[in-house]
């Protein structure tokens, strides 16, 4: 397997998440060693099969998950920027989950406290990134999106 996520990559992803979270007036996330380890293990599993698919919910406890694939070795900021760019499709007037905005809403979910991230390279040079969030965002209960996905501050 290729190289695993470096401390620099972890910090890049975390910094980008927290800069975006700040725009939405929600508390910063902290990196969690256990979540980093689990995300790393799963990114390596994805890289070995070269198939991008979410892990079974039962295997990640109460964690949410974002995934990213690129044909090259992607930077942490690039991954976070790509997930966050889904904000353009999010309707703050009609909050809720849609498949086209789930990466963005997971990133800025107010109640999420911790994250972990992993990256692995496949034999063809492509890279797989896994982010895990605790507690998970994108909870579809009544009122949860209104409370947790706040519009960016002016």
UniProtKB/Swiss-Prot annotation:
GO cellular component terms attached to this protein's record: extracellular exosome; extracellular space; Golgi membrane
Gene Ontology MF annotations: protein homodimerization activity
Coiled-coil residue spans: 30-53
Xref: CDD domains: CAP_GAPR1-like
GO BP term (any one): positive regulation of epithelial to mesenchymal transition
Keyword terms of this UniProt record: Coiled coil, Golgi apparatus, Lipoprotein, Membrane, Myristate
Annotated ranges, domain SCP: 14-132
Organ and tissue specificity: Highest expression in lung and peripheral leukocytes, and minor expression in liver and kidney.
Annotated family: Belongs to the CRISP family.
Protein name as it appears in the record: Golgi-associated plant pathogenesis-related protein 1
Biological source species: Homo sapiens
High-level lineage: Eukaryota, Metazoa, Chordata, Craniata, Vertebrata
């Amino acid at each position: 397997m290729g190289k695993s996520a470096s401390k620099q990559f972890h910090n890049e992803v975390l910094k980008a998440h927290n800069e975006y979270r700040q725009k939405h007036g929600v508390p910063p996330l902290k990196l969690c060693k256990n979540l980093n380890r689990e995300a790393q293990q799963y990114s390596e599993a994805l890289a070995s099969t070269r198939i991008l698919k979410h892990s079974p919910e039962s295997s990640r406890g109460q964690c949410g998950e974002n995934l990213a694939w690129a044909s090259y070795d992607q930077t942490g900021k690039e991954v976070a920027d790509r997930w966050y760019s889904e904000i353009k499709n999010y309707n703050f007037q009609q909050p809720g989950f849609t498949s086209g905005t789930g990466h963005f809403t997971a990133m800025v979910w107010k109640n999420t406290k911790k994250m972990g991230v992993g990256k692995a390279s496949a034999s063809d040079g492509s890279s797989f990134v896994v982010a895990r969030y605790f507690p998970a965002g994108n909870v579809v209960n009544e009122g949860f999106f209104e409370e947790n996905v706040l519009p960016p501050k002016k």
